[in-house]
Curated annotation (Swiss-Prot):
Family matches, as SUPFAM superfamilies: Pectin lyase-like (SSF51126)
Binding site for substrate: T174, R324, W326
Name of the protein in question: Pectinesterase
Marked site positions, Transition state stabilizer: Q231
Residues the record marks as active site: D232, D259
Source organism (scientific name): Ralstonia nicotianae (strain ATCC BAA-1114 / GMI1000)
Keywords from the named record: Aspartyl esterase, Cell wall biogenesis/degradation, Hydrolase, Plasmid, Secreted, Signal
Catalytic activity as recorded in UniProt: [(1->4)-alpha-D-galacturonosyl methyl ester](n) + n H2O = [(1->4)-alpha-D-galacturonosyl](n) + n methanol + n H(+)
Length: 396
């Protein structure tokens, strides 16, 4: 692959400082690692991703711009306060959320959370007013909402996320395993960790998914949050596959090891650290970061921009896929319908990719077995692209 060259051009002197403009020269695109042109890249920006929502086929455009984040904690005034040690109005996060829901109204409600470990399941129901949930400690790791649950956990006697209702299934299931689930619109979070502490292999099953956070309502903003798990850590998607919801993650941290950012929603990861953990899989298997199930009528799935992709646990170089398409509810290639079945969409741009990323083929076959293909394909062409990335895993 042709190497990328960056050149810096001095454009002005301001206050004694030289201001540089960086221009990225085009990288040769390959069939297995397609790169956007500068012109095409203008179609895949934060503004484009987050401009529209609603029913696919008749999306509503409101040009939502969340890039300012949720605001400074110093400017918040808590309507409800939570402290695990009993020094505040509520001891659990869910109790404060329930109080905000029961109070009704449409005004934004602020819930402060004192540093501590909150071992509980959290549901922000669809009926909730706009809620800002924030940790008082600026270190997100000091305020953790954590629970141990997973897809194969026996359902009998197990608690499941209350946003999901009851089920007759023998096991908890993927989404019911979520430590926290947000179904309301206009949810904001800051200075918090959402974690699923399930230890994979506790229960035998090929699907060891254990969700830390599921975002199912529109216009969610999460700033300085950590979302930690292994398989299926973070889900973004509406309750209906025909509906587009949006989430914006700013200066946040997402960790996992298999398909750990997944779903049919539209999400932007801006200035985030996306970290693969080799603690469970080690060097024995290639894995995947993104697993989008974007509907074919939605041009925007996941965007990572100005972000860092790295690893912990010393996985081998050139081993990790950036992603694969999650062909949700499609059992195999014979059941895949071009233009109707899901066709995941991801763009990674202006980001730093660590050496663990596969160089020649960073995008894997879909979950239904569709071979990765970017053009002239038997099945729907994959919608995975890169632009202007750097680092040992960028292929540049």
């Amino acid at each position: 692959m042709q190497s990328k060259t960056l050149y810096l051009k001095a454009t002005a002197l301001l206050g004694g400082c030289t201001v540089f403009a960086a221009t990225a020269l085009a990288v040769t695109s390959t069939a297995t690692r397609p790169q956007l042109s500068s012109a095409d890249a203008r179609t895949y920006t934060i503004a484009k991703y987050l401009a529209s929502f609603g029913t696919i086929g008749s999306l509503t455009t409101d040009n939502w711009d969340p890039t300012g984040g949720v605001g400074a904690v110093s400017g918040f005034r808590a309507n409800y306060a939570v402290a695990a040690d009993g020094t505040a109005q509520y001891k659990t996060v869910q109790a404060a959320i329930d109080a905000a829901v029961n109070a009704g109204g449409v005004a934004r409600r602020y819930i402060s959370v004192k540093a501590g470990i909150y071992n509980e399941l959290v549901c922000v129901p669809e009926s909730a007013p706009p809620i800002t949930l924030y940790g008082l400690d600026a270190n997100a790791g000091n305020t953790q909402i954590v629970y141990n649950n997973a897809n194969p956990t026996p359902a009998s006697g197990a608690k499941t996320n209350p946003c999901m209702g009851t089920s007759s299934n023998a096991t908890v299931g993927t989404l019911r395993s979520a430590t926290a689930m947000v179904r309301a619109s206009d949810f904001h979070a800051r200075n918090l960790t959402f974690k699923n502490s399930y230890v994979e292999g506790t229960y035998a099953d090929n699907n060891q998914s254990a969700v830390a956070l599921a975002v199912r309502g529109d216009k969610a903003i999460l700033e300085n949050v950590s979302v930690i798990g292994n398989q299926d850590t973070l889900f973004v998607g509406a309750t209906s596959t025909t509906t587009v919801i949006r989430a914006y993650f700013k200066n946040s941290f997402i960790q996992g090891d298999t398909d750990f950012i997944f779903g049919a929603g539209t999400a932007v990861f801006h200035g985030c650290t996306i970290q693969y953990t080799a603690a469970r899989l080690g060097a024995k298997a290639a894995s995947y970061i993104f697993a989008p199930s974007t509907a074919p009528g939605n041009p925007y799935g996941f965007l990572a921009i100005n972000s860092t992709f790295n690893a912990t646990g010393n996985p081998p170089n050139n081993s990790l896929h950036l992603g694969r398409a999650w062909d949700q509810s499609v059992s195999g290639t014979s059941a895949y319908i071009n233009g109707s079945s899901p066709n995941g969409q991801v763009v990674i741009r202006d980001s730093s990719l660590g050496a663990l990323i596969r160089l020649a083929d960073p995008w894997g076959p879909s979950t239904a077995g569709r071979p990765y293909c970017s053009a002239n394909c038997a099945y729907s062409a994959n919608r995975f692209f890169e632009y202007n990335n750097t680092g040992a895993g960028s292929g540049n």
